[in-house]
Amino acid sequence: MSNADTATINLADFLRAQRRERYPIAVVHGLPFAGKSIFARQLAQRNSFGYLDVLTEVSNRPELIDTIDRFDVAALRSLILSYATAAGTDVLLIDELDFLVPVWAGDLVSFQEMVRRLRHPEKQITFGFFLQTRPSLEQWRLMNAAHVSCVLPFESIRSL
């Protein structure tokens, strides 16, 4: 299956199937205001997936907001894993990460490395990231065992 076939992907099924993969993730990217957040929340609700809005979570926690200029990939990993534990779900959708990109100086290499290494210590969880499109994401080659890209353009996802 090639990237040209991504137009037929049902994201809920894709995320569930990713549980068996070496990298149990999907990165969905699209233009600003394309409806990614609404889609992610609805997908989570309809499928009993966890949903983490990182911007809201950081904004609502004084101990995190005070470190926003130093909020690095390790801090994000810690936040995601603690939220995944609390959510008690097999799939966690992670949204509104884009506010952190300026903190990371526009370099998503450390983010990509974190995604590759993101594992819950106690259970198999698939992580779905929703991000704004940027060149480093469009060029990222992260494939699953079936040679299907785990980096998916939002416009190629089948609607709910």
Across the structure, where does each feature detected by a protein language model lie?
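N-terminal pre-Walker A segment at the start of P-loop NTPase domains
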Residues: M1-R22
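Walker A/P-loop nucleotide-binding motif
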Residues: R20-F39
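P-loop NTPase Walker A phosphate-binding motif
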Residues: K36-F49
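Short glycine-rich substrate-engagement loop in P-loop NTPases that contacts/grips substrate
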Residues: Y51, T56-A84
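Short loop/turn segments at strand-loop or loop-helix junctions that form parts
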Residues: V54-V58, D90-D98, L131-T133
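Mid-core helix/loop region of P-loop NTP-binding domains shared across ATPases and GTPases
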Residues: D72-V91, E113-F130
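Conserved P-loop NTPase "ATPase switch" module shared by AAA+ and STAND
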Residues: T85-D107
